[in-house]
């Protein structure tokens, strides 16, 4: 081969090498991608659309028993859930046999017991779909539709750490009031021709009730986790102070993650990576209100971070609160599987998947188009943040293999 031909060939090979490196880092590094992640993504997409059907294949088990058996330390529901439609149908239609004020918290909710003894949390509609919540990123009432959308995003991301949620219409006069406790019943009132209630909570006020359209109220129901899995509450290391003029340490100390890594349960095990997964999840939905989080009790840091209470989300599609990503850009680590999944979802796939997943919900359309568009844009921002980390520290440091011992972080 002549020298000139060799030079041309080497130049071509060099261009191919450089292109391959750039392409792989931007579109899935081979060290990050694996066939199982690809198969998992395709399985998720195949089973994405959930039709609410009453029929269960397991005729000897109730939907509540099946959902309870799904729960394990690292997931609330399994990857493949052929019974999901039947369980969500039961959540949306089963007779309410008791209604009470919600469990502890700052926002209005009701605790319902459905036929068969299953507890669910009911969050009422407070805003129309196109209402924009102004102010701080954690401002406003809970958004019931945000709970529904967040659950389906949890499915799409492959986390499987959020309790099941579905939209539901309830008749306050015929379904709730006849079975309501005195404590809940005492908070009912009529505004114009609409039945309303204000419940019992830190911010609940008689002057700020949630009102039905006549007697019919739209809301979301969240499946209560089984009692055999008691929860333990933790202060989120990247929580806000909620005090004007007072910053949390992470808001001014760029080396804050180093301090977090030295404290339990973030010094070993999966919890820190769960925190970072959650930061990505919260950023996509616009949730800046995760000041605490729950895991299962007595887990020694091994159980998942459970994605509860996602209703302070999807408030303002024009607001991008980048500080939600602080765990990601301060620690500059993320699971390989999360990185892979995020890459599979770009180029409009996330918006399409989320819209498809929610299409059969009883309160569909769950989100307005501006919110769906924003989720796609926020995904690009997450990927850009990860790329900044890989540019600075290298992919081998930033992308953490899920099965790798985590004590090195």
Swiss-Prot record:
Observed phenotype of the null mutant: Embryos show severe stunting and increased mortality at 13.5 dpc.
GO molecular function: ATP binding; kinase activity; metal ion binding; phosphotransferase activity, alcohol group as acceptor
Coiled-coil annotated spans: none
Active site: 289
Glycosylated position list: 193
Cofactor: Mn(2+)
Topology relative to the membrane: Single-pass type II membrane protein
Catalytic activity: 3-O-(beta-D-galactosyl-(1->3)-beta-D-galactosyl-(1->4)-beta-D-xylosyl)-L-seryl-[protein] + ATP = 3-O-(beta-D-galactosyl-(1->3)-beta-D-galactosyl-(1->4)-beta-D-2-O-phosphoxylosyl)-L-seryl-[protein] + ADP + H(+)
EC number annotated for this UniProt entry: 2.7.1.-
Domain of life: Eukaryota
Assigned keywords, A-Z: ATP-binding, Disulfide bond, Glycoprotein, Golgi apparatus, Kinase, Manganese, Membrane, Metal-binding, Nucleotide-binding, Signal-anchor, Transferase, Transmembrane, Transmembrane helix
Disulfide linkage: 196-211, 201-204, 257-331, 332-389
CC terms in the record's Gene Ontology section: collagen-containing extracellular matrix; cytoplasm; Golgi apparatus; Golgi membrane; nucleoplasm
InterPro entries in alphabetical order: FAM20, FAM20_C
Expression by tissue: Little expression detected in the secretory stage enamel. Weak to moderate expression is observed in the gingivae and odontoblasts. Strong expression in maturation stage ameloblasts.
Protein name per UniProt: Glycosaminoglycan xylosylkinase
Organism, as annotated: Mus musculus (Mouse)
Gene name tied to this protein: Fam20b
């Amino acid at each position: 081969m002549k020298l000139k031909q060799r030079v041309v060939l080497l130049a071509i090979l060099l261009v191919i090498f450089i292109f391959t490196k750039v392409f792989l880092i931007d579109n899935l590094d081979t060290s990050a991608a694996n066939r199982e992640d690809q198969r998992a993504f395709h399985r998720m997409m195949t089973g994405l659309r959930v039709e609410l059907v009453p029929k269960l294949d397991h005729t000897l088990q109730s939907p509540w028993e099946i959902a309870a058996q799904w729960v394990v330390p690292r997931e609330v529901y399994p990857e493949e859930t052929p019974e999901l439609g039947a369980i969500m149908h039961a959540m949306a239609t089963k007779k309410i046999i008791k209604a009470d004020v919600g469990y502890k918290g700052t926002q209005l909710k009701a605790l319902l017991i459905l036929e068969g003894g299953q507890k669910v949390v009911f969050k009422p509609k407070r805003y129309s779909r196109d209402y924009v919540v102004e102010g701080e990123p954690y401002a406003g009432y809970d958004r019931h539709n945000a709970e529904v959308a967040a659950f389906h995003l949890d499915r799409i991301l492959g986390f499987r750490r959020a309790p099941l949620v579905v939209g539901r219409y309830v008749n306050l006069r015929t379904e709730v009031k006849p079975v309501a406790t005195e404590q809940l019943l005492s908070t009912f009132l009529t505004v114009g021709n609409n039945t309303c209630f204000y419940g019992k909570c830190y911010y609940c006020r008689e002057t700020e009730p949630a009102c039905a359209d006549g007697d019919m109220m739209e809301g979301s129901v969240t499946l209560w986790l089984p009692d055999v899995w008691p929860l333990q509450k933790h202060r989120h290391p990247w929580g806000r102070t909620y005090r004007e003029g007072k910053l949390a340490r992470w808001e001014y100390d760029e080396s804050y993650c180093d301090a977090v890594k030295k404290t339990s349960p973030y010094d070993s095990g999966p919890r820190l990576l769960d925190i970072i997964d959650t930061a990505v999840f919260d950023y996509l939905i616009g949730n800046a209100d995760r000041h605490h989080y729950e895991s299962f009790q007595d887990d020694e840091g091994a159980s998942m971070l459970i994605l509860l209470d996602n209703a302070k989300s999807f408030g303002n599609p024009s607001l991008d609160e980048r500080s939600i990503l602080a765990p990601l850009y301060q620690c500059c680590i993320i699971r390989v599987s999360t990185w892979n999944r995020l890459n599979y979802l770009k180029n409009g796939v996330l918006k399409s998947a989320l819209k498809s997943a929610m299409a059969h919900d009883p309160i569909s359309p769950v989100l307005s188009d501006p919110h769906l568009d924003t989720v796609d844009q926020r995904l690009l921002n997450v990927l850009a943040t990860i790329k900044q980390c890989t540019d600075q520290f290298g992919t081998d440091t930033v992308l953490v293999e899920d099965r790798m011992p985590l004590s090195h972080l």
